[in-house]
Amino acid sequence: MQYYTAPMEGLTDRIWRQAHQRWFGAPGAPARYYAPFLSPPENRVLIKKKMAELDPAANPGAPVIPQLLAKDGALAAWMVTELRRLGYTEVNLNFGCPSGTVTAKGKGSGMLRDPAKLEAFLDEFFSRTEGPVSVKTRLGVTRPEEFDAILDIYNRYPICELTIHPRVMRQLYRGEADRAAFAACLPRCRMPVCYNGDITTPAQLAALEAEHPSLSGIMVGRGLIADPALLRQAVGGAPASKEELRGYLDELYHGYTALFGASSCAVSRMKAHWHYLIYRFEGAEPLEKQLRKTREGWEYEVVVNQIFTLPLK
């Protein structure tokens, strides 16, 4: 069983990957970091700023898997060629993102609206590229039963691994992941399958492994942002200490300040991390409200110093 980190836009960028690997990485935990999605440019001219996220020199440690968000199979295949020139072997296709700004363009889980278009995309894509390609998907748009037809399509192609997030597009991240629907589809999958969705504790990881020992991997997202040591604990390591969390968060903050050129921009990114992480501190609710109101670096630093006077749960 392998453990992966989910691609989360605005959270699991190269600054985070470097800090997470340094502070909480353990052998095989994670085995792979999936980078947030990259949209291939229609003019086929790569944007240096966006490609910096995937500079191999900026991604040491565990392997990084680029993820593509596209609806044009030929364009996606071209992008795979460019990524392989950088040294990446596996590339992941995103048919799972439920964001309205993404699905309105027919991308992400919006690709699942029309199985015929999905099949046409995969036909075009696989006719133009070779090598390992994985897929991240949802069960459908409105009903889990839609996945029967979607899986029939996936099974026709040389997908090296299928990561299933058992929600439908319309749910976004509301409600619970449909574990029953996930279990029902497993016998029909002709490729290795990875589970993703609502894993927040080492006990949940262990229970999922026991229930589905044939899985190739488990991918964690929001649970790992809330508990950066989650995967380390899954392989027998220690929970995150307050000192580790402080060092990790300081590294993120300074890294984002250097990247964006202003602490105020870094504060915005850090608040996205604290949205999940603050609940690890006992009695932090009043400070959470203060943190949300911060705009400047000095304001952020004052509130964070106060948070770290609290005990961990």
Kindly give the residue locations of the regions a language model identified.
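Alpha/beta catalytic cores of nucleotide-metabolism and tRNA/nucleoside-modifying enzymes
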Residues: 3-4, 9, 15, 120, ...
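Flexible, glycine- and charge-enriched loops at secondary-structure boundaries
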Residues: 111-115, 175, 242
